[in-house]
Amino acid sequence: MKLAREFYARDTREVARDLLGKVLVHRDGGVRRAARIVETEAYHGPDDLASHARFGPTRRAGIMFGPAGVAYVYLIYGTSHCMNVVTGAEGFPSAVLLRAGEPVEGCLHSTRGPGNLCRALAIRREHDNGRDLAGDDLFVEDAPPPRERIVAARRVNVDYAGPWAERPWRFALEGNAFVSRAPGEWRAVRGRRR
């Protein structure tokens, strides 16, 4: 069963945790590809100096200011696509970066890291940016709560963001082999063991 738009219309940090264990599905050219989400990062509001929204509704990040439940796909380093899901209330820019997945079906190659996840599921900015996640081509399927403990750490590659870089808004399923980076300073998320 597909996640409803209401799932995304909540605090981005809650959505980031609650996406863990759900299944990201992309149907492209008659092929279904899917991966279980095992790592996410939350980007919360215009004051979050690690967020693309810190510069306002630019051509790239304007989608973050829109309705929840939409894909925000962008290109980094000129080669890798990254997928976020827009969250929260319209007008308050927030999104969850999907950092890594565990292959479920039809994945083309590695799903460790946001660029690899998009490559494995054939998710591309030119086709999928702005796509409604309540549609039939790109969506997240509900799944039973994960058995693994949810852990948190600082986000990756955001040292430029000052104190915002230290926020523990990167979430993962503890011990999952598909988490994209070495754990570093992981800590358990209170009340989130399922």
From Swiss-Prot:
Molecular functions (GO terms): alkylbase DNA N-glycosylase activity; DNA binding
Alphabetic keyword roster: DNA damage, DNA repair, Hydrolase
Enzyme Commission no: 3.2.2.-
Family matches, as CDD domains: AAG (cd00540)
One of the GO BP terms on file: base-excision repair
Disulfide bonds: none
NCBIfam families tied to this protein: 3mg (TIGR00567)
Family indicated by similarity: Belongs to the DNA glycosylase MPG family.
Protein name per the record: Putative 3-methyladenine DNA glycosylase
